[in-house]
């Protein structure tokens, strides 16, 4: 949404409030609207209108125009204004004590874009079980937005030819908002990196997997929202020479440890709670920094894997030396009797 220069608070008070709200304030984006409210008490009253923030929020995230989300936002301290203040900035993880019960009843609001146009929206409630023995808490954490046999038709086409160039274009053209809402604690957070941090082919399925990740360095973990795109025919891979129509095959959320394994439900929910409670940042370069953090995390994963392989190799060598020494000692004992 475009921004406009804000008129001086004294001069703008001469304009009718309806003109200001319908012709001026509706042209502002969220951060500009919030800063405009601080210029005068008159503008503060106009800028805090619930309908204004509701329309701005729905324009930004179409998926939230869902009865379940509307009901959840209605309980926020300042309604849509509080929701926008939580969801628009990037969030930094705050450490959570494992003694605290993990959040329950979380809602996911997902909006997927291609070259600025929305191609998919959905709201899904996260069914979690209470208690330490619940299967959800002890199983690998994964939230699937699409059903196994479901796919989303898009206007995206792979023209054929240079596959790597198409992969790069897809990485740059796709954008994802994944807003996590906690109706109980009345908090929300956009846990996606917005722009993709990586795109690579899954050699098992042949689909292109595009990742929108938030790295939690303190926990050595990655909150990964993954979008899989493939051929319109489910049984067929994209032909790299001929090309063809592309469908969205999978949209999922998972929390991975440094080994790339999906973490258990309880540990994952604790990390997600840390993002919901985390400090917010609206710096202009946050999308670039999110990708840089991911690339640094990938390097850290490679270093960790190499160190693990060296340790295992050293342990194998020690075991071999010990076994050989015992073998020599045994035969020496037998021969010298």
From Swiss-Prot:
InterPro entries: AT3G44326-like, F-box-like_dom_sf. Residues 10-58 form the F-box domain. Coiled coil: none annotated. PANTHER family: F-BOX DOMAIN-CONTAINING PROTEIN, F-BOX PROTEIN-RELATED. This is F-box protein At2g27310. The lineage of its organism: Eukaryota, Viridiplantae, Streptophyta, Embryophyta, Tracheophyta.
């Amino acid at each position: 949404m475009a921004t406009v220069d804000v008129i001086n608070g004294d001069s703008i008070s001469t304009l009718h409030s309806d003109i200001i709200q319908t012709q001026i304030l509706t042209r502002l984006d969220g951060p500009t609207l919030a800063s405009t409210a601080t210029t005068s008490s008159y503008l503060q009253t106009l800028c805090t209108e619930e309908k204004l923030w509701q329309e701005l929020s729905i324009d930004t995230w179409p998926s939230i125009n869902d009865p379940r989300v509307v009901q959840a936002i209605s309980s926020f301290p300042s309604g849509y204004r509080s929701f926008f203040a939580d969801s628009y900035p990037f969030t930094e993880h705050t450490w959570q004590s494992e003694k605290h019960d993990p959040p329950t009843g979380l809602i996911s609001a997902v909006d997927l874009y291609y070259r600025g146009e929305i191609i998919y929206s959905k709201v899904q409630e996260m069914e979690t079980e209470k208690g330490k023995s619940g299967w959800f808490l002890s199983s690998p954490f994964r939230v699937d937005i699409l059903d196994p046999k479901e796919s989303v038709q898009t206007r995206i086409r792979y023209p054929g030819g240079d596959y790597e160039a198409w992969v790069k274009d897809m990485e740059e053209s796709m954008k994802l908002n994944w807003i996590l809402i906690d109706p109980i604690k009345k908090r929300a957070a956009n846990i996606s990196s917005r722009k993709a941090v990586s795109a690579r082919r899954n050699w098992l399925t042949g689909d292109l997997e595009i990742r929108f990740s938030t790295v939690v360095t303190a926990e050595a973990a990655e909150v990964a929202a993954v979008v899989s795109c493939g051929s319109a025919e489910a049984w067929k891979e994209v032909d790299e020479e001929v090309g063809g129509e592309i469908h969205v095959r999978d949209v999922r959320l998972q929390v991975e440890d440094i080994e790339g394994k999906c973490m258990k439900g309880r540990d994952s929910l604790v990390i997600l709670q840390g993002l919901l409670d985390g400090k917010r940042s609206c710096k202009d370069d946050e999308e670039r920094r999110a990708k840089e953090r991911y690339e640094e995390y990938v390097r850290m994963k490679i270093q960790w894997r190499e160190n693990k392989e060296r340790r295992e190799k050293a342990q194998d060598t020690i075991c071999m030396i010990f076994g050989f020494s015992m073998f020599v000692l045994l035969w020496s004992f037998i021969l010298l009797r």
